[in-house]
Amino acid sequence: MRKTLLPLLAVFALPLAHAASDGQKQADDFTKLYSSTCFAYLPELGKLTEKLADFPPVPEEDAQNFLRGYNGKAWIVPHEPENYIIAVMPEHEHCALYAYHADAARVEKQYLDFVKKPPEGFTAEPYEDTHDTTDGIKTHTITYQWKASDSEDKPTFMLTTSTDPQSKIQAMISVAILAKD
């Protein structure tokens, strides 16, 4: 399944059109980076780890905030006006990208445009759509799964956004391959 998924994933990792405003560009850059890293390398996260080796690592004590208790590594991806953080957890086939600030509405639109159009042979199914408040910070999480009748693997995509200026992370997008229930 992973060998057939790789070429399909590459098709979806194409660059996005140039945006008109800074907010749009910021969201587009976030989505483009996700597409060319976590998504494009999902079946082979070890190769992504090799490509990220030249980027500055997040210090180990801080990396745990991005790894969510899993084994893996996190890197700082230089970007103007702010850097991104990418966390790769190969043992769990899980990759996540974090933005300190993002245009939540545009990131959500791009995410939904993407996950609702799976490659041929897959269906897209909404899994979760929740609004939460933690420590006074409001977040919105949207999760989709792609399913194929001939595979036990389910690429699962999750986006969490916040429009709260006090939020330390305003966008987090991740992908993991989960086994069927």
Where are these regions (language model features)?
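Positively charged n-region of N-terminal signal peptides that target proteins for export
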Residues: 1-4
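Broad, structure-driven detector of short, well-ordered beta-strand segments within folded domains
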Residues: 78, 82-89, 153-163
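N-terminal leader/targeting segments
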Residues: 20-85
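Bacterial N-terminal signal peptides
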Residues: 7-15
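Long, charged/polar, surface-exposed segments that mediate recognition or autoinhibition
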Residues: 79-141
